[in-house]
């Protein structure tokens, strides 16, 4: 059987059995006779299951249609490429962060580079930002007294520019050189009313889930599931979202909807929604063409998610997206699911507390027998788990979805509720992405998870105590439920305990040819040892010497060619970039492939610095793109305990 047909049949079976299960739950299991509280709690549990399942149904339907809307990039002659305005939005980000993004934009490939107009859009009117723009030869658009956050900044830029296409980048998002060449042609197909092309959000540093849980080699970035999977699937209903950066937009379409919208803290999401209502296609492509920074503190991550939650709800209410006839039924369903997604965190809390209420306090939330429950629930649950795997190309599974929801749930329930009843947040606060050394622990955020963990453990002990034989069998569903929740809570505790960050800049695995010469030397005519990098960063480099090099200086088989503290010069040469660096050896070590030399580096000139940054960032990042399929809960828990006791985490003394 073809993989797509097999997947679709599993989806159909999952929808069928889940529908039967939900019908049974609604009409046959609510404890109406056990009192008002238990009946209300039972209804909440059923509603939580319905919300979660409907979200899955929408994703399954979109996945079954997704292949129909993966568009081929049109082949367009170079002379047809139009002018493009590149907007880089900044508010208060440091100049060294902006430097990397602006620098990368100056290297963007285009048939006629005179048609690419780059602007640093600064709503802080900072002198350092203006000087940076002048230094790198790009335009500067300052805005004082901005009352409309990012929308106001971009609308000001729109008023001072005129190109038919606009590319937008956040301050930390570094585009690859081919970004425009792989997005602009979509707008040049006369048969397609293209309004916006969104490329995936990608990140070159570890996100907090990867970092705090010591999983940087085992799981992809948490946002990959939406950017690379969900948003692409929503091409099927023309509901792909603008995520604020790494995007190209048609100016005339923006002007038709009145520019970037006000009255929401997620102007990007509402922009794409308004474009869709006006009949334009918003397309989410699949190739990563830019990368930026994930949030580096729990507080900033939570603040970011609260803003997303409130903004999506605001925008859906502002545009009447769920009920408007200006969108197709499939689009309205997608926005209903987008709205309900933010309620899934309340659902997660209900799923955690429901077995606790039963096992610890004796409150019955489901009225049924054991075998009846098993007959209706088990097929639905198993097919649900299998379907999650087929929804994603191994980017997300049911376990990691539960872990992420458990970590975020306590902090999103109240903002989602308040926003839904009309208590709005209008103030925009820029997400802090500054990399810091030191611990990432946030013990005050640990309190809700600590309480839930204690309640779940107490429930497990009380409910299983003194049971054996068939009594344990009849209790197995509740015990499974408690253990399942316990897993997510243990991960949440580890997450909040944090981990010590020892580096200010990210190391990116890369194999790039280098030429090295020990001691002082002139740049011209450098002739020395050849090597290949292992990894690169803004402050350092690790490399191996090529085989067959002259190593007479070695006194024994595995002794280093260069000694610690020795200074030398490195030339790095790629197909597109060339940089010369002063280097100082920090250490060397032996592994199974030979000796690795690690050195701190400093570019010689401004041109070397600009090229060195491109050598580092103009590539696909080296962090995982898929889950490690063999990784288990036992592996993760064991690793977290071992590394924290070893001194890698917050337990270090």
What are the residue ranges of the model-derived segments?
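The conserved acidic donor/metal-binding loop of glycosyltransferases
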Residues: 170-174
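Membrane-embedded multi-pass helical conduit in multi-pass membrane proteins
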Residues: 21-50, 76, 341-426, 442-499, ...
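A conserved acidic beta->alpha catalytic loop
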Residues: 121-129, 146
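Cell-envelope/extracellular polymer assembly enzymes that use nucleotide-activated donors
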Residues: 83-87, 117, 270
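Structured alpha-helical
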Residues: 440-653
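Short, acidic, metal-binding catalytic loop of nucleotide-sugar glycosyltransferases
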Residues: 103-115
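N-terminal membrane-anchoring/stem segments of glycan-assembly enzymes
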Residues: 1-80, 133, 345, 468-497, ...
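Long helical/loop segments within the catalytic core of UDP-sugar-dependent glycosyltransferases
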Residues: 142-165, 177-265, 276-277, 298-340
